[in-house]
């Protein structure tokens, strides 16, 4: 697969970059994508939810009324889950939601996500981002030049760049990642993937 390289003004540079078909034109495995995204979202959960059961609610040591003769169902404690103010029956307790996915499946899922975006024509290769200082307005103008100012966009960089990260972090539609650290969810949760030219090689080295 080949894509034209463009600059930050949105104009073609005349250069064409060849993308590895193993990464950008692979067969899409929906099941691998499902497993990886499910794992990523589950692992974000804290699992700290907690309610009190009848042994943890304050009070309730005394039998609320006599066993027989009241016409009511028998009760041994006013903190039974059947009564107002009582403990919760089978309520949520703290536990982990971690799901393990093999590295092979994770790589397959990322290849599938990138191939899906490439097949839809939603990958853009940009020559370079040149920021001399932190400037959100400059980044917003670049997105506007690319026609992405109203679209959720993932920008992939070859390495961490503090100036670029801080320039783009206040733009709601923008998500910036280092190329080899972008997850399947990052790729799917955007309308367009913008890759810096140098980031293409890093992705191919990681996933090919």
From Swiss-Prot:
Keyword rRNA-binding: yes
A Gene Ontology biological process term: translation
Regions of compositional bias (Basic residues) in chain numbering: 60-71
Superkingdom of origin organism: Bacteria
Pfam families: Ribosomal_L4
Entry GO CC: ribonucleoprotein complex; ribosome
Region (Disordered) residue spans: 45-84
Gene3D superfamilies (alphabetical): 3.40.1370.10
InterPro entries registered for this protein in UniProt: Ribosomal_uL4, Ribosomal_uL4-like, Ribosomal_uL4_dom_sf
Coiled coil: none
Functional summary from the UniProt entry: One of the primary rRNA binding proteins, this protein initially binds near the 5'-end of the 23S rRNA. It is important during the early stages of 50S assembly. It makes multiple contacts with different domains of the 23S rRNA in the assembled 50S subunit and ribosome.
Record text on subunit structure and interactions: Part of the 50S ribosomal subunit.
The family this protein is said to belong to: Belongs to the universal ribosomal protein uL4 family.
Name assigned to this protein: Large ribosomal subunit protein uL4
Species the sequence originates in: Prosthecochloris aestuarii (strain DSM 271 / SK 413)
């Amino acid at each position: 697969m080949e894509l034209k390289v463009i600059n930050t003004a949105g104009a073609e540079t005349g250069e064409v970059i060849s993308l590895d078909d193993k990464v950008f034109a692979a067969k899409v495995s929906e099941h691998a994508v499902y497993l990886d995204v499910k794992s990523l979202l589950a692992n974000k959960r804290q699992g700290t939810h907690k309610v009190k059961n009848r042994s943890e609610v304050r009070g309730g040591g005394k039998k609320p009324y006599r066993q027989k003769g009241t016409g009511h169902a028998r009760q041994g404690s006013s903190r039974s889950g059947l009564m107002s103010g009582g403990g919760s029956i089978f309520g949520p307790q703290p536990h982990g939601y971690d799901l393990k996915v093999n590295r092979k499946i994770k790589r397959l899922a990322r290849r599938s996500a990138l191939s899906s975006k490439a097949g839809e024509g939603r990958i853009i290769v940009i020559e370079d981002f040149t920021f001399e200082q932190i400037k959100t307005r400059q980044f917003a103008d670049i997105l506007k030049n690319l026609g992405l100012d109203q679209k959720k966009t993932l920008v992939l960089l070859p390495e961490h760049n503090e100036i670029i990260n801080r320039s783009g972090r206040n733009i709601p539609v923008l998500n910036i990642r280092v190329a080899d650290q972008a997850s399947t969810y990052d790729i799917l949760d955007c309308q367009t993937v913008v890759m810096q030219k140098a980031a293409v090689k890093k992705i191919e080295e990681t996933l090919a």
